Structures are given as C-alpha cells and as structure tokens.
C-alpha cells in the first residue's frame, strides 16, 4: 500500500493569504497543514508517500519535509501542472503506485477521532475494491454524497447533488486497489473540466466493489478551505491539545510509536526544536 497526498490547487477561496504560499503550507495552530493528512497515512501504516503539488510550490514542500527520513518515511514529489481534478492524482502517480494498492488523501483535510488508527488499518488491509469514508453533514448538497445499505455497500454516489439521497458526505480520504490507475485513464472531464473522483468511485460502485466506512459520533472531519474553517480547525486543535496534553498530527511521535524512529532519533529531532512547545512535547514524550 502506497499513499498520495494531493496538495495542489490555487487556494483562491483563501486569497490574499494564498497568493504567496500554498494553502497546504499554512499553519493550523502549531503545525503546517500538510502534517495532518501526512499523519493519517502514517497512522494507516503507510511509509511510501507521494506528495503532488502545484509546480510553483514543489520546492517549498521539499524544504519542509525533505525525503521523509526525519519521520521514518520515504517521500517522493510530483507536480500537477493545473488543477484538473482529484482523479488525475492516480495518472500522475502511476509509476509511483506500481502494482500495489493506494490511499489518496487531500492535503487540506483534517481527521480526528477515537480508534481512527484501527479504522484506517482495516481499510488498508482490503486487497480488492475501494473504500470511501462517510461523514454526516447538515448541508450535503455542498459535497460528494454517498448512499449505502445496511452492510455499508455503496448504492449511489453523486457530486454536489441538488436533491441528496443521503446526508453522508464523502470525505477527502480514499482507499483503492490498483485498478484506480486504469479507471482514471478512462475518465472524461466533467462539465467543469475536471477528472472527478466521484466518477472514478462510481466505476467501483458499478462492479459492486465500493464500500463505505462511517466516521460517526465523536469524530471530527475538518475542511480548511475558507478563512472561517481554517480558524475553526486551528481552534479545535488547540483545544484538544490543551485538554488532553497530547498532540494531533505529531509525525515524530507516530513514527516512534510505529517503530520507524528510535528514541534517539526523536531526541535528536527534538533538540533542534527545543525552544518550541513542539520540541518540548517530543522531549517529554521520550522522558527527557
């Protein structure tokens, strides 16, 4: 299983903030936004990850994350020349994906909830078909919407329907078998000129291999596409961390708990950051 983070786009809804920096490099409380989707892939046990960016932002992501060795992972980078749809990520990443399965996550989505690691690993363990993650919303017409039966098999999937068949939005996290690459190549641009992820998932639906994993009560899915939602996400992270004294999306901690970094590795990393609360958290974590 390999992972792809799609961190392209121009972030126009956040102008003028994003005129000079990628949205996914903006801070969400105490970490760059890209840390949050990266942490999800790491929690799923995925170590080989491709970060797809806009051409002008690629170097900045590489400066921030390097080759991934600081976090016990292996990072590669690619560019999306123009924002031509989420499903294009599978075409861009074809060589990287190879013959295995793949998890795609959007670079501006934040997930938090109990037992999330177990949920992710269950989805990653599936060898056939695709899994989407549903989250109940009050305004489903703003999202891709999935309808499913009592066994969580998808019955329909639509992009921003005027009359939604359910109130379960499809989040920006998708697990696919290797057919995703060929399915993406068969797609034609939608009315808005993009290769739609909903159309790709519908191909799995049509052969009966699209399942739905529910993110239910007590779970948070945060979009960061507007100034208001970006502020709300930062406030959420701050509140949870202050109450629990545990960090959300601490990549070094996840790598250490996964056995990908040693205590010495974490200590070395922490000492570079010891003047920050983040660095102090890492030192406390390993008992220093």
Swiss-Prot record:
Subunit-level organization: Homotetramer.
First-level EC class: transferase
EC number: 2.7.7.24
Keywords from the named record: Magnesium, Metal-binding, Nucleotidyltransferase, Transferase
Cysteines engaged in disulfide bonds, as pairs: none
Keyword Transcription regulation: no
Cofactor(s) this protein cannot do without: Mg(2+)
PANTHER family recorded: GLUCOSE-1-PHOSPHATE THYMIDYLYLTRANSFERASE, GLUCOSE-1-PHOSPHATE THYMIDYLYLTRANSFERASE 2
Role this protein plays: Catalyzes the formation of dTDP-glucose, from dTTP and glucose 1-phosphate, as well as its pyrophosphorolysis.
Source organism: Neisseria gonorrhoeae
Cofactor note: Binds 1 Mg(2+) ion per subunit.
Record bears the keyword Protein transport: no
Gene Ontology terms: biological process: biosynthetic process
GO-annotated molecular function: glucose-1-phosphate thymidylyltransferase activity; metal ion binding
Residues the entry annotates as binding Mg(2+): 108, 223
Family classification: Belongs to the glucose-1-phosphate thymidylyltransferase family.
Pfam families assigned: NTP_transferase
Protein name listed in UniProt: Glucose-1-phosphate thymidylyltransferase
Reactions that this protein is recorded to catalyse: dTTP + alpha-D-glucose 1-phosphate + H(+) = dTDP-alpha-D-glucose + diphosphate
Family matches, as InterPro entries: G1P_thy_trans_s, NTP_transferase_dom, Nucleotide-diphossugar_trans
